[in-house]
Structures are given as structure tokens and as C-alpha cells.
Amino acid sequence: MRERDLADTSGWEPWQQDYRFGVILLMPPPHVAAPIDALRQAYDPKSHAICSAHISVSDPLRRQLNDDARKELQELLRAVEPFDVQYDRPTASARRPGVAYPVSPQERFDELKRVLHQSSVFEGFAYSRRDIPAHMTIAEFLTIEDSLRICADLMDRAPRGSFWCDRLEHVVPDATFRFQRRGTFLLGTSR
């Protein structure tokens, strides 16, 4: 990514500035993402507009992802074998707003995060949300009461299932803070 490829961040909120160089996400395949994106659109259009269905697996990048950094990340990810991701009934908390699918196996996501954060693009302090368990958000910009109501509404009708994780996506926000795919990293040694 060249400097001219970076978005004009002058209109962004302070918390959005951290994401200037992007983030690494697990993006579910289209047949999984489509019904989850429909829920995101219905219950939290703001989140849906920012990014489609995903599972966050990295801190925001600390610097631009140049060719050397891409090679470094790809080499690190060769050590992580692809795995099956399970997602079940959405959950909500009485302590903080949001509705999300818990995903498993959490140990594989922890391994993925550990390996990713060895890269030089994450040098510096650990981002405050690094230790949050991996999950797939349905809605986040709402109240606790709305979260609990939505979760109850979705309990028996939200899709659930599994999908194969064999790749990660580098996504970067544009000037309107809408994330765009910029690159793909394959997991494991079989390419």
C-alpha cells in the first residue's frame, strides 16, 4: 500500500484513526456471510455499512502493509493449519451492549492471534481489545436493553453452522470508513 492509497482520515472519529492501515479479518464465505449480513443490516445498519460479516483476528496495523510485511505475514501464517469454524446461537450480555455469535474452537483463534501479532506490522503496545474472545458480531452500536431484546428475538431463528477457515483478509477503510479488501493470506503449507 502506497501513501496515496491511504484514505483521508480528516473526517474520522478519534477511535477510527487506529484503523488507518487496516486490520486482518476472517471473512466467512458468501453462503455463510449473506444471512449474517442480512441480520447486521436489519439490526445494526451502521456496523453493516462499515464492514460485512467478519471475525476480528488482529489488532489494527501499526504501519503500512508493504511487500516485505506481506511476505512476513504469509510466512508466519504458513505455520497455522486451516480449521473448521463453528458458530451457534447468538449471545448478548447484561453488562455491555452487543449481539454476537460465539465462534469455536477458541484455541485455534488464540493461536492465530498469537502468530499474527509476531509480525513487525504490530510492533508497539498491544491493542486494548486483543484479549477479547473471537466472535462474529451481529450488532454493536445499540443499548444493552436492545441487545438483550434482539438476542431473544434471534435465539431460535438465527442461522448457525460451520465453515472452513483457510484464509484471512487484509481490509483497509476508505475515506468514509468503509472497509475494503486489499489482500488475502492463505493458512497452512499446502498452496
Locate predicted features.
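Histidine-dependent nucleotide/RNA phosphoesterase domain, centered on the 2H-phosphoesterase fold
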Residues: 1-191
